[in-house]
Every structure is written in structure tokens, then in C-alpha cells.
Amino acid sequence: MDKTQTDTGMARRTVLSAGLGAGLGLAALGLAGCTPSAKTSGSGSGWKQFSGTTINFISENTAPSAAIAANSKPFEDLTGIKVNITQMALENLVQKVKLDMSGGTSQYHVVYADPYQVLAPLSQGLTDLNQFVNDKKYPPVEKGLADFIALDAAGRFESKSKLYALPYDCPTMIWMFRQDLFDKYKSKMQADLGFDPTPSGKITWEQYYQIADWFNKNAKADVPYGTGHQAKQHDSLQCDFSNVLWAYGADYFDVPDIGTVGSQNPGKSTLTTPQALDAAKFYDKLLKVAHPSSTTWDWDGLGNAFAAGQVAMCPNWHEYAATNEKSLPGKVGYSILPTGPKRSANNWGGTGIGINANAKGNEQGAAWLFVNWATSPATQVMTLKSAKGGGTPTRTSVYDMAEVKKAEKRPSDMPNMLTASAVLEAWKPENIGLRPKVATWNQLDTIVYTNLSKMIAGSQDPTTTMQAMASQFDKVNG
């Protein structure tokens, strides 16, 4: 297996819900430009005990995994362990992990455990990492578990007694906009619309719609459309819609902690409340003024379109800042998403990495050393700097580092940190958007984006759409 083997499919993933109360999570791992001297602290204390072992890591196509695949030598030098990394679209990863675990095999020892599509439905196939954390024969987790953001959301299911993954990445949906175009047209836009159009949490979703429509009608010489969306019939559509659903004060279920530790029994869906119906009606209206190719774009398609100058603004995952800075250097601004009748809600898409419980003997120990190293502060900083990656740290201590804080302003050698102000605001409890972490989410997710696709195609009205979703949710969950 080639170390950088990839499967065709979408880059970057879906994801979104993490824990707030326990510390929200940021994400990413670290490796770019990493040298043996930048290894995890405590090197030489238990790192070589599985030397000669080979392990396989299966991951979604993500920035941190790309960075580590490009530079895993520091880990191999530190441990003597060879790691093969396979990257692919999330939906393909889910199927491969299911087959591996259900078959009692461990072709993949380390697993990218998306909280909704892997961790919740397959938690029984993952090793409880507490056994390694509490065993002194292994190097300690640097700075301890308390340093992780969103440990519950990314690493646990149903209970805090078991830990299935360590937070690895944390893409979060924010408002990306062409700062240069807003600067150019601000006065004219403000005069026409009657409000200051500067992107911020003070702008409502209704005003966002008006801004998009204004660009469509008044700025064609500079940009084809005002807004773009990841509205393909795919998980990305559910992600995009969820921001609006939560902003309007609605949700999928009414269960405490369902977005953090999750639940096996979410009960009846709450998708037919007046707030949910209003959210669907607004989203349907918004897509009518969006770039028409929005219905063909997932997050990666949208990211490429924004970087190519096709839209003036969009809601997208903050890790696309690195791409923006390459294509539109100095021309992009970032804010939390607009506010609905209830709040601003910003989808959190963090994920942890865990260990296949089918792995045997030295494979388990070697896999843990990789999980520990890949989520360490030093590795996350290296990933931030990587030309191949550019991850999103999941450690509080990383955000407190002077060099990382400096990178929040241009010129920056860590372009994803240019979003820090918006992202840290998005992670506040009142602003974060957390999907329900339930074992049936793969089925529910499909129900959401299938019905939404019918709605935005004009074959199903918003009220019928939400009623259909709710009915199908309840049928799946019994």
C-alpha cells in the first residue's frame, strides 16, 4: 500500500458537531515541514517499544492527513513504526471501515472516526483509549486530555466513561467574503439597501439574501453571483442547511447533549415546528438567488468556485482559507455566519482518530503511539505550516502560542489562522452548531439532503419537505 494512496472522491468532509460544554474542538494534526527535532516531548520514553511494526491509517481527504502523508518520517524516526496512509472521500471511508470491523479484520489500524458516520454507529468496533492514557508504559498525552477542544463531541458516545478518539481536526463553517468587492461597493450597497452590509454576526440571514441579490444585479463586471452554496445532493447540503435551521431556533431533535456525547434514543423529530418550517422556506428562497451551479457543488466544489471568483461570498469550512490565500491573496475576509431570528449558528465539523478494536498486540500499541503523536501540539503546529496541509488545531495550547497568534494577521505562514477571530467566535456556546450524534445518522443525513434536493429543484414545497423529513426520521428511529 502506497503511503499517499488516495481514492477518488470529494476532498474534505462533512462533519459537524462537537462538544462545547466540554471544550469545543479545533482540529488538525501536524506535520508539515516537521523535523526529528520537532518531535513530541518525552521522546525516548516508550516511543521505541513497537519498532519494526507497520500500521495502516485510513482517513478522509483532509488537510492534516495530507500533511502527515507528505512527511511521516519524523514519526517513523521517533518510533521505528512505519505508517501507511490511505485517503478517500468520507462516504467511501465509512463503507471500508464498516467492512473491516464487521469482518473481524484490521486492514486499517488507525481510523478517522467521523463522530456521526463512524464513531456513533460503530463505537463498539473502536478501542477505548483510556487504557493507553492511563498506562504508564506509554508516553503521556502531552499537556493532558484537558488541552483538547471538543473532546466529548469528537471522542465519546453516550457516556463519558469511554474515550474512542482524540480530536484530530475541526473544520467549522463561517462566512467567507470578497473583502475587496465589499470595500468597492459598500457605499452604493448601503445607500440602496438601507443598512451597513459589512459582514458580521449583526447581519441577518434576510440581509445576507438582500446582499446576494444586490451583487447579482449590480456587480456582474466583477463577480457572476453574490452567493454560492454546497447544495449538491450530498452530505454537504445538510451541512449548509443546518446553519439556517439552527439560526431560526429549530433543530433535528430535542435531547440534551445530543450534539456532544450523543444518544442512542433521540426520540421524535422536531422538524415540523414553526421555526423549522420558516427555516426551510428561507433556505429555498436563498438558493433561488445563489449561483445556479450551487446544486452541483459539495464543499470542495464551492471552495474552488469561490477561489475562482465565481461568487462574492459563501458559507464554507474555514480550512479553505489556505486555498483562498493562494488564489485571492489579501482579498478575502472572514466572519461568523449571519444571524437568524434566534442566533448565529456555525456548523462544527470536527473529527477524532481512533483505533480499530480488531487490531492485535503490537498493532494496538503502535496505533496508539501514532494517535498520540498525530494529535500532539508540535505536530499540529507543523501541519499549520505545511504547504500540503494547513490543518485546524484541536489543542488550546496551540492557539496560545506566540507564533500561532502572529499568524492571525497577514502576511501569514499559517493561512488558516487568518480565520481565527471568526472561528473562535463561532465556537462560543451561543454560536456553535452541533449536529445530532446518533447511531442512525447515516440514514437520517440521507433523508435530509434527499428531501432538500427535491425542494430546491422545485418538486417539493418547503412545508411538505419538512413533514417528509420528520416522518422518515421517526420511521428510522422507531
What are these regions (language model features)?
Residues N56, K73, S102, S161, ...:
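Extracytoplasmic/periplasmic substrate-recognition and gating elements
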Residues T62-K82, D180, V448:
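Short, polar/charged alpha-helical segment
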Residues C34, S294, S412-Q472:
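C-terminal capping/gating helix-and-loop segments adjacent to ligand/active sites or protein-protein/ligand interfaces
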Residues K73-I149, A165, K184-K186, Q190, ...:
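Extracytoplasmic "Venus flytrap"/periplasmic binding protein-like
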Residues G42-W47, P115-I174, D240, G333-S335, ...:
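Hinge/lid segment of periplasmic solute-binding proteins
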Residues M1-A11, A22-L29, W373:
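N-terminal secretory signal peptides
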Residues S51-T62, K82-T86, V110:
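Short, well-ordered beta-strand elements
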Residues Q207-N216, V244, Y248-T296:
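Glycine-centered hinge/linker elements that transmit conformational signals in sensory
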